[in-house]
Amino acid sequence: MFTEDINFEVLDFTNNKYENLKPELNFSAKNIEEAKSWQKLLKSKLIDLIGGLPKNREKLNSEVLKIEDFGTYTRETILFDSAEKMKVFAFLLSPKFIRNEKLPVILCIHGHGKGVNDVVGIKNQVTRNNFDGIHKNFAIQAVNQGYLVLAIEQFGFGRRRTQDHLDSGNESSSSCNLLSGTAFLLGETMIKWRVNDAMAAIDYLETREDVDLNRIAVMGLSGGGTTSFFTSALDERIKLAIISGYFCTFKDSIFNINHCIDNYIPGILKYAEMYDIAGLIAPRGLFVESATNDPIFPVDATKYAINKAKNIYESFDAGDSFSYEIFEGQHEFSGKGAFKFAKSFL
């Protein structure tokens, strides 16, 4: 017998494992009381799986390094602490055409690329206003629509990389693999660390007098969608989550397609699929967008997950709090439906 006659398709093994799973916390509630009880159980389990969350918030030690004027908005360069020896870099964009009132705020979280620069239009140290690249400078789009915007740099990207990546001259390189592996060795996850950064960002927003704390949204693309999704599931201060280029099923995305290790939570499929976790956001707002030709988060699986999430939202009598857009494109941000939904929701 020759080896070419033998089926060595390794994904047959892993997919068979998936098909035989019986997730303990798949949504099956028959009424709103059962749904609320289910939420508590899944939220507690999710916190355990990512490696826990701090019981006490870190002192922020925030500082504003610089304030710049860009005509229609100002940009503050900000630092704050999210954990011991963990400093977060961020930009805060404020619209100049709205004065003397508390504003709704969008926490903007970038995906893989050059870091926070990708959402605030910085390229080669020059700030632009054209909306190109996969991120389409969505933080600038948001401030132009009258939102206060806090755009944070995710751990492992941009300025927050290991020294070898900072010295490499490649602005798009990331330290995700090393740092995510380190997290696993410590019994934690990159998702935990990035969610904690995002929660600290909201802590920072709570210190500002120009923020309407009842109108906080989070918006993220790709790996930023990951952080936005899990932060919204775990932090009820967020009224609206806008998830771009991420919402799908685990099975059809990170389970079967090669992805950055920063996406993974060991053991999550023993308890829930991605659409179940969307139910932790209910009845708060959730808007998801997906491109027709996204190669790493397949749109057909996204449509399936959307239907599942919609059913969960309806169980909370919150069907109007969930919406979505499928648009023509690749793995990229659109925002057309998202900003329209945000205007009606915030």
Regions found by a protein language model. Name each.
Residues M1-T74, S82:
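N-terminal targeting or regulatory segments adjacent to alpha/beta-hydrolase or S9 domains
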Residues I67-T127:
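Glycine-rich active-site/cofactor-binding loop and its immediate structural neighborhood
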Residues E101, C108-N196, E206-T207, D252-I257:
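Cap/lid segment of the alpha/beta-hydrolase catalytic domain
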Residues L178, T182-L185, A200, K239-A278, ...:
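Mobile cap/lid helix-loop segments that gate and shape the active-site cleft of serine hydrolases
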Residues D210-S222:
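Alpha/beta-hydrolase fold nucleophile elbow
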Residues I281, V288-S290:
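Short beta-strand/loop motif that positions the catalytic acidic residue
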Residues T292-F297, E332-F333:
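Acidic catalytic loop of the alpha/beta-hydrolase fold
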Residues N307-L346:
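C-terminal catalytic histidine-bearing segment of alpha/beta-hydrolase fold enzymes
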